[in-house]
Swiss-Prot record:
Keywords of this entry: Glycosidase, Hydrolase, Repeat, Signal
Encoding gene per record: CELB
A molecular function GO annotation: beta-glucosidase activity
Superkingdom, natural source: Eukaryota
Major enzyme class: hydrolase
Protein's name according to its UniProt entry: Endoglucanase B
Length: 473
């Protein structure tokens, strides 16, 4: 069993029990901090250059990204991300009607990557992405319904025993591709298509039973856009408190997404972000409907300082209304296309640390850190004196000190261990090197004097000293 978890002052839940918490989506989203999207990877399609019959999983790297690894997700978790969207294109990976059987190789690979995310103790969002069969035209509706039901039944069965840390997202940006209404908020034809598909998706997952009866589900507006037409004609299912609205917002457009005339590299006006958040709040949040912004971002224009300010502003606004956000990372850093890369997936180097810093700063007092537990063994040094002495940091968090220096598991910074099946704090005497404050790699100083810390977050790892956030170590 993998022991992977989040420390808090209130609870300690071990992933692996598969017990499904019966909580509303309004409660669930409170535990989501910053999200990261595995863009241009499992959603990549290369029908003209790949022989899908010979190799079903080659498409993962056919748009230029490297094979996804567990270490990538551990790195992201260490940086503060706890929500991981996994965009997935199923076309090319399933058979003909009427079964539309998903290829076993492909399902296995998708399952592996979902586990990479879950293994951090965070949340995974699995979806249906760059499909052509669900373009939102009436002529496609009946065939699209059949495929949607078949694909989601198989996905639901594959992950039937997964708990609330796995979220299903029915569709990605369903819209009338190639039509004048494609990105303009839709029309009656498009709205009806999306509403019927959303309703069918929810009913399909619920009918599979087991944990899926309580599965948290995300459904989009038309094109997942924040537009009066799309939102006013969106139908949210009644009587189901485990459904979340999925929205995308690359705002301000000219700063964040526009790659042509009118594009700007300076962030000086947050009015578009304000409008988006005010709309979300008035249309959904104020009515008790939870929202996740499943995609947002600002492409690289050699303007990292501006993107840092933008990220802090964006996340601060979203956090103020209780909306978690998932940044889009397509793995591209240079060139003429969309440059939304954040982390080098080969070296695990954060290419734009200031941008990450802005995201974390935007969380403000809502910041929560997640600890990824990995199987290691601490080394007893000549200075080690294993005792029952409880004079270590974990006592203040409600956990005893580890009796010895050799424990079954430690977290990534070596501060927490598992001993006799229980979490415990590892004493500083178990290391002959000075402890390095983990917050420095996120751009925050160490707290200099814990007695002067005037505020701590709920897991006691972050503090406020002299008006500034600092890491407690």
């Amino acid at each position: 069993m993998k022991f992977l978890n989040t420390f808090s002052l209130l609870s300690l839940a071990i992933i692996g029990s598969k017990a499904m918490k019966n909580i509303s989506s309004k409660e669930l989203v409170k535990d989501l901090t910053i999200g990261w999207s595995l863009g241009n990877t499992l959603d990549a399609t290369c029908f003209e250059t790949l022989d899908y019959n010979k190799n079903q999983i080659a498409s993962e790297t056919c748009w230029g990204n490297v094979k996804t690894t567990q270490e990538l997700y551990y790195k992201l978790s260490d940086l503060g991300f706890n929500t991981f969207r996994i965009p997935t294109t199923w076309s090319g990976h399933f058979g003909n009607a009427p079964d539309y059987k998903i290829n076993d190789q492909w399902m296995k690979r998708v399952h592996e990557i979902v586990d990479y995310a879950i293994n951090t103790g965070g949340y995974a969002i699995l979806n249906i992405h760059h499909e052509t069969w669900n373009h939102a035209f009436q002529k496609n509706l009946e065939s699209a319904k059949k495929i949607l039901v078949a694909i989601w039944k198989q996905i639901a069965a594959e992950f039937a025993d997964y708990d609330e840390h796995l979220i299903f997202e029915g569709m990605n940006e369903p819209r009338k591709v190639g039509d004048p209404a494609e990105w303009n908020g839709g029309d009656y034809e498009g709205w009806n298509f999306v509403n019927e598909m959303n309703d069918l998706f929810v009913k399909t997952i619920r009918a599979t039973g087991g944990n899926n009866a309580l599965r948290h589900l995300m459904i989009p507006t038309y094109a997942a856009c924040i537009n009066d037409g799309a939102i006013n004609n969106f139908k949210f299912p009644s009587g189901d408190d485990k459904v979340i609205v999925s929205l995308h917002s690359y705002s301000p457009y000219n700063f964040a997404l526009n790659n042509g005339a009118g594009a700007i590299s300076n962030f000086y006006d947050g009015s578009e972000i304000d409008w988006a958040m005010n709309t979300i709040n008035s249309k959904f949040i104020s009515r008790g409907i939870p929202v996740i912004i499943g995609e947002f971002g600002a492409m690289n224009r050699n303007n990292e300082d501006d993107r840092e300010r933008w990220a802090e502003y964006y996340i601060k606004k979203a956090t103020s209304i209780g909306v978690p956000c998932v940044i889009w990372d397509n793995g591209y850093f240079e060139g003429e296309g969309e440059r939304f890369g954040l982390i080098n997936r080969s070296t695990l180097q954060v290419v734009y640390p200031k941008l990450v810093n802005g995201l974390i700063k935007g969380l403000g007092n809502s910041i929560k850190t997640r600890t990824t537990i990995r199987r290691t063994t601490t080394t007893t040094t000549s200075q080690s004196q294993p005792t029952n002495n409880d004079s270590c940091f974990s006592v203040n968090l409600g956990y005893s000190c580890c009796n010895g220096c050799e424990v079954e598991y430690t977290d990534s910074d070596g501060e927490w261990g598992v001993e006799n099946g229980n979490w415990c704090g590892i004493k500083s005497s178990c290391s002959n090197t000075s402890r390095i404050c983990w917050s420095e790699k996120l751009g925050y100083p160490c707290c200099q004097n814990t007695s002067s810390v005037v505020y701590t977050d709920n897991d006691g790892k972050w503090g406020v000293e002299n008006g500034n956030w600092c890491g407690i170590y």
